[in-house]
Amino acid sequence: MADAKNDIVLSIRGMSKSFGRNRVLDHINLDVKRGTVMGLMGENGAGKSTMMKCLFGTYQKDEGKIFLNGKEISFSGPKDALENGIAMVHQELNQCLERNVTDNLFLGRYPTSSVGVVDEGNMKKKASELFRKLGMTVNLSQPMRNMSVSQRQMCEIAKAISYNSQVIVLDEPTSSLTVQEVDKLFEMMRMLRDQGISRCV
């Protein structure tokens, strides 16, 4: 039993969330094992996205507890969640379309040189290594506005992976992808599984 408990990276107990009189989540329980892919099934409006956003700190839950590696956690917002090992790719992409791929990858966390100046060379190197590792061919200098929705979504997934998170939450990740891109996404998921990273989709 102890080993089974240690294998659970994320646990939700009694999570509830209401918007006015509309109770969207009603005492939800969920366990996610380390290195697994978990799909959340349900009709539109069933509360899947709401649960994910409560987990990521976008919404604050009304009731319940969340545990990461057995430790109770409560995030004040998405930045707090990212710093503690949980990343999320939203169905509605949150990107700066006038900036290029590299800039979007490092928004809010630009690496700096020893004199405090943004280290663009280091950014490009890390971005290139990430996409090469994921088997993705991307023009790092291309503005996001010139990319298709599916290409932008794959870049956002790559960004979530770049945080070295223990859990990555994907909200309907295949909705804008082509058949070939879905295959690539599943390949990426298998790679993450082998690295012990868990996903909720």
Predicted segments — roles?
Residues 2-201:
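Glycine-rich phosphate-binding loops of nucleotide-dependent enzymes
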